[in-house]
């Protein structure tokens, strides 16, 4: 289910609670509604995917295409040659407004596809806590006895090549580490750069490595109201936003500069 509401103007808050067959269309309509109601004063968009457990893979691809004009969105990789595929955006009409995406420990699967793609491609700042870490694709094999076998077919990979399965997507800004939103500055934003680079460089982390990394921004330490406050603060300060979005990107050329 999807919905839209506006917080303190001129910022639009769009909530995505799942990825069903109508999600992309509903998102597109919500953005157009905000543009029509607010006009040129619209400073940016907050896409709230907290506790979004995912849904249809093709809808995750379509939602990402709303904001990524070309290049890799995500890829899948497994043992079978047919499981290896790269999903690229070929969209000619993309939304270019500044954007913040909210996630938490219950944001999973399709929501993580979108968050990882927008972060890697320098298209959005991710705010909140580390996401759930569901980064695999399953297929159902029907058995002769009318039973079913659920087979893990492939892993999902972000544009940078890391898999968030069990690891999760690490936010650009971890809510738990921001004590005073009014004092959020460039130093605070830049502090997470090295950690994000390490996170995105992981390919096959051990269980201990996963556990230690997830402790950096624990999923259970989210603060819903503070997430919105941080997102609003970023969108009202173009310089701060530009620095924040670049801390998580692997595509430096696509990230905004100030």
Q: What annotation goes with each model-predicted range?
A:
Residues 1-9:
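Short, small-residue-biased leader/transition segments that mark boundaries at the very start
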Residues 8-258:
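C-terminal "post-core" interaction segments
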